[in-house]
Amino acid sequence: MLGKNIKKFRLRKKLTQDKLARLADIPYTSITKIETGVIKKPSVQAVAKIAKALGVSIDVLIEGG
């Protein structure tokens, strides 16, 4: 669910996975693995960085707001 939500918000912002990775300062492979469900429980730090890069709260990112 988290991966799908990240992808949804990323596409709304018209960001590529690579661009989001750079904005969040996390590896590109982490973004792809989280979005596809390979990483099911990313670290709180990674989720916080992704949420900040997408301009949403962690709660909204997790719940899909």
Regions found by a protein language model. Give the residues of each.
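Short basic helix-loop element that most often maps to the first helix and adjoining turn
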Residues: 4-23
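Conserved hydrophobic/aromatic packing and binding residues within compact polymer-binding modules
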Residues: 6, 20, 31-34, 61
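Recognition helix of helix-turn-helix/homeodomain-like DNA-binding domains
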Residues: 26-41
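DNA major-groove recognition helix of helix-turn-helix/homeodomain DNA-binding modules
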Residues: 45-60
